[in-house]
Amino acid sequence: MDRSKRNSIAGFPPRVERLEEFEGGGGGEGNVSQVGRVWPSSYRALISAFSRLTRLDDFTCEKIGSGFFSEVFKVRHRASGQVMALKMNTLSSNRANMLKEVQLMNRLSHPNILRFMGVCVHQGQLHALTEYINSGNLEQLLDSNLHLPWTVRVKLAYDIAVGLSYLHFKGIFHRDLTSKNCLIKRDENGYSAVVADFGLAEKIPDVSMGSEKLAVVGSPFWMAPEVLRDEPYNEKADVFSYGIILCEIIARIQADPDYLPRTENFGLDYDAFQHMVGDCPPDFLQLTFNCCNMDPKLRPSFVEIGKTLEEILSRLQEEEQERDRKLQPTARGLLEKAPGVKRLSSLDDKIPHKSPCPRRTIWLSRSQSDIFSRKPPRTVSVLDPYYRPRDGAARTPKVNPFSARQDLMGGKIKFFDLPSKSVISLVFDLDAPGPGTMPLADWQEPLAPPIRRWRSLPGSPEFLHQEACPFVGREESLSDGPPPRLSSLKYRVKEIPPFRASALPAAQAHEAMDCSILQEENGFGSRPQGTSPCPAGASEEMEVEERPAGSTPATFSTSGIGLQTQGKQDG
């Protein structure tokens, strides 16, 4: 079979082998009908993504995971040996979302956004090739027995916030932000997080323009309350999902309400959750509570989240360095007194550290920094107008609001919808990354762009949010030395400058393009996922006082070991 036919799919153009074929040149009879043709922008966007088209049999595949709509393989190119990840769509009704995801990823370039590598066609379907992330996802990392100090946890939270801030600045929000879609990369500098899975991403609606209400999509455990109630929502829904992820990071528990306490109105049970935080930095816990606020207007933006986490991370690193300086003389004295201490043999390293049925380890012990210095008390306030603490003497069992609604099926489903024309239009309007951002591999054939012979009328400016990301393009390091600064020029993000305390950049106008696309009929499908049981974490003794309606918010005081409820109101 001819290769051009083998690499084509219904509704999509075959791979262009020569520039003359795209432009209608070459002098062949088959190109006569193409002379002078004005190609629509949707076709040109696909050509850009298809410039790195490959076949499945060009790779060796190893399955490493699966989701509701796709299976993920670790693939190695037979010729070059390059390792990538292949996301194979398994649901025919999800083809439109897969196509949109490919087009969107092809126009995003940021160290905390999963990097697009190319596309693969197999059995008439389009599949995305991305960079391979070597340490799984955030949910798997938190479920492991690895000890994660607070500096590492805050750094991972910072990476996710920076990636989402970049996405929001581009005028798009994720709508399916979960700990499963945050991938973990490990290198010589430690752990870093990368945001993935943009199949449900949508253009941020403009309330002033009377935008159409968006459909209910996402994973229920992480969905914002306004989304679950089928109310109008915007990018602040991503902030609530991020808050649930922060709860997972702090307590190292699953987002399942059987482990993470929730309220009947799909909010976070702050009073119950504070028993599970151990020696969490109070300002980190305060940020988590702010993100989980039931009122979308009271949730911070990812710009504010990133700045707060940057301050927290800097303080934790200073405390860690101070603790190391105090530990060095003590460790030296112990070695002088006990020179005969012998290290365990290498055979002990081979003993498995986990039982056949692993159970989640929740790190609730005091940090070593508490041994040397007593931290001053700090307060954590709950400013959620829809939250009422329960009376400690009449506590009710844990609430699972997802079991009360039949349509949510216990929360173990995933809602999806066809992409709207607005997000497709925005995808085509986004500037593609520069050629230096994603170098082609040896097996990838570069495709020269066609000569522009047409001009569209000027369009209205793109609806980018003005709260730009001053820290986008930076990547913190867990090493002892100063973190490297990655400027926006390196990642070809023209709209976002590197971190400065200057004013925010204004949105840039983009050229209007034809946004027509064929849409298939959508079906509703779900694939329940099994959940592994984990023990509830040890909680600390607390006294909880109920606040009457209309009173000031409850205030929780912390002094380095657990949290205690103050008997007086703020102010």
From Swiss-Prot:
Q: What class of enzyme is it?
A: transferase
Q: What does the UniProt record report as the effect of altering G11A in this chain?
A: In a breast infiltrating ductal carcinoma sample; somatic mutation
Enzymatic reactions: L-seryl-[protein] + ATP = O-phospho-L-seryl-[protein] + ADP + H(+); L-threonyl-[protein] + ATP = O-phospho-L-threonyl-[protein] + ADP + H(+); L-tyrosyl-[protein] + ATP = O-phospho-L-tyrosyl-[protein] + ADP + H(+)
Domain Protein kinase, chain residue ranges per copy: 58-313
Q: What is its main location?
A: nucleus
Cofactors needed by this protein, per the record, are: Mg(2+); Mn(2+)
Which residues does the record list as Phosphoserine (modified residue)? S219, S369, S456, S460
What SUPFAM superfamilies does this protein's entry cite?
A: Protein kinase-like (PK-like) (SSF56112)
Locate the region Disordered: 521-571
Enzyme Commission numbers on file: 2.7.12.1
Kindly list the biological process annotations in GO that this record carries: actin cytoskeleton organization; focal adhesion assembly; protein phosphorylation; spermatogenesis
Q: Which domain of life is it from?
A: Eukaryota
Q: Where is the composition biased (Polar residues)?
A: 552-571
The cellular location(s) given in this protein's UniProt record come to:
Nucleus
Q: Name one Pfam family in it.
A: PK_Tyr_Ser-Thr
Which residues hold ATP? Answer: I64, G65, S66, G67, F68, F69, S70, E71, V72, K87
Q: Give the regulation of activity.
A: Activated by autophosphorylation on Ser-219.
Q: What does this protein do?
A: Dual specificity protein kinase activity catalyzing autophosphorylation and phosphorylation of exogenous substrates on both serine/threonine and tyrosine residues. Phosphorylates cofilin at 'Ser-3'. May play an important role in spermatogenesis.
Family designation: Belongs to the protein kinase superfamily. TKL Ser/Thr protein kinase family.
Q: What is this protein called?
A: Dual specificity testis-specific protein kinase 2
**Gene name for this UniProt entry:** TESK2
